[in-house]
Amino acid sequence: MSSKQNLTTVFNKESGEIHLGGIDALVRLTLDQVRTDERRGLKTGMFVSGYRGSPVGMLDAALIKQQKLLLEHNIKFVDGLNEDLAATAVWGTQMMHTVGKQKFDGVTGMWYGKAPGVDRSGDALKHANYTGIGKN
């Protein structure tokens, strides 16, 4: 990241070139998704959960650091106790379309974990795929 850029600028800039590392790019990705949906006329949110011990273990710290900005864009981060519980929590957000009145047109779910955690989370991941998601 250039010394002339701070993280607030990097996360808020919507045109031109930005320079950031991989973890910050994942944080930025959440904002870009919600902004893209907004430009399409949709009111969406995002739910992110994962395990702190994953290879992207600093993602949780970066999301917590930007929590105020993320909440302003309807992006909620919840630490997972383990990969299985985190995957199940994300799956829950994808069932919004099956209940009555919703606050959002859709919720994007983002899960992260490590390889053994993927094995452990098989049921949640399979059932989430079988259940499907809402239109947005």
Kindly give the residue locations of the regions a language model identified.
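Thiamine diphosphate
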Residues: M1-N136
